[in-house]
């Protein structure tokens, strides 16, 4: 957890010797990748970061594992020719098949054609994602390990080397990212993953490691009314699905959604808890009782917070408690998650036990 940037000053040098201030940027001590957008193209031989503050266990460290520079593609599909917004999730009123036929981009022509026919598989591919506060905020005030960073599962899985096309609507000025987590880590705990930045509009990401995809939309305060939901369209990747007991559209669909799952792992969400266990174990040990299972975990997490007095003083955690399967040790709780060896799944996944 060392080396996270907060306040920085970014400078550039055209000759490699003399540096000029370019911009101030506050990375807010985030553990996820950050993005800096320049208003115009900069011709530079070198850049310099002056890190003025940071966060982490050690304090005083500044560390950057990787830094990349990109230019925007000047030749790009104009979503407004067919769709209502940059997420390309809905056709504009009055669009006809003739309009679609004139589109010079086969990928978007195909999406539009399926939409106009009412046959586009929108579930899990097109969703609105709400913002969650950074769990570190309440970790500091409550003097506990931070709760989950993965409150926004997508129901999409990806393969290593795959090009994932993600179409993002209005971001309202916030940094949005994706995390791909691969729990398949023999003799280890696969919690964590790789984070990718998203821009409003078309994003083509080359995925380095397989896994389930989560949206990272985090605010630096507990309440941020400006952080409106963001619509995101996963135009590629494979639908794995997830179950959310708080989503009315999932009512009565536990068995259906679990049976449709294509990945080794499956997300189960409640109001207070979030499970990611092996799909086969949920099918074997949970069976048709998915609602009962997640309700029990919700009750456990709620009862813990109630016992601490958090409900009485309106200090309930805004993030869920995250529970994932792993393949070392037995069970443990640490920052951002609690982990359970697969050998315990006959009990962990059973509402009766």
Residue ranges and their predicted role:
Residues 2-30, 174-196:
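Non-cytosolic beta-sandwich-type ligand-binding/adhesion modules
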Residues 1-21, 30-79:
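Aromatic, loop-rich ligand-recognition surfaces of beta-strand-rich domains
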Residues 4-7, 32, 43-45, 60-66, ...:
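Residues that flank catalytic or metal-binding motifs in active/ligand-binding sites
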Residues 255-257, 264-353:
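Catalytic cores of extracellular degradative/oxidative enzymes
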């Amino acid at each position: 957890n060392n080396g996270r940037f907060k306040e920085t000053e970014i400078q550039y040098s055209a000759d490699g010797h003399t540096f000029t201030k370019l911009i101030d940027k506050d990375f807010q001590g985030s553990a996820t990748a950050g993005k800096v957008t320049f208003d115009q193209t900069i011709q530079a031989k070198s850049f310099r970061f002056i890190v003025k503050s940071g966060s982490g266990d050690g304090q005083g460290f500044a560390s950057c594992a990787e830094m990349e520079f990109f230019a925007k593609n000047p030749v790009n599909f104009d979503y407004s020719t067919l769709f209502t917004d940059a997420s390309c999730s809905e056709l504009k009123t009055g669009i006809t098949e003739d309009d679609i036929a004139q589109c010079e981009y086969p990928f978007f022509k195909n999406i539009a054609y399926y939409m106009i026919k009412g046959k586009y598989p929108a579930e899990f591919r097109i969703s609105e994602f709400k913002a969650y506060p950074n769990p570190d905020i309440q970790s500091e005030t409550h003097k506990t390990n931070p709760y989950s960073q993965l409150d926004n599962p997508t129901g999409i899985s990806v393969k290593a080397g795959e090009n994932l096309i993600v179409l993002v609507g209005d971001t309202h000025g916030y940094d949005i990212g994706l995390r791909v987590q691969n729990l398949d880590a023999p003799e280890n705990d696969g919690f964590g993953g790789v984070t990718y930045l998203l821009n409003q509009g078309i994003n083509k990401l080359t995925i380095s490691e397989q896994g389930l995809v989560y949206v990272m939309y985090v605010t630096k305060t507990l309440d941020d009314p400006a952080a409106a939901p963001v619509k995101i369209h996963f135009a590629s990747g494979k639908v794995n699905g997830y179950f959310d007991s708080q989503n009315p559209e999932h009512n009565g669909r536990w068995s259906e959604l679990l049976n449709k799952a294509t990945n080794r792992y499956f997300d189960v969400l409640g109001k207070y808890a979030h499970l990611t266990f092996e799909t086969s174990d949920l099918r074997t040990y949970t069976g048709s009782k998915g609602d009962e299972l997640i309700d029990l975990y919700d009750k456990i997490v709620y009862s813990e917070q109630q016992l601490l007095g958090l409900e009485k003083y309106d200090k309930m955690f805004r993030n869920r408690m995250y529970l994932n399967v792993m393949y070392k040790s037995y069970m443990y709780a640490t920052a951002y998650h609690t982990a359970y060896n697969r050998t315990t799944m006959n009990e962990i996944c059973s509402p009766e036990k």
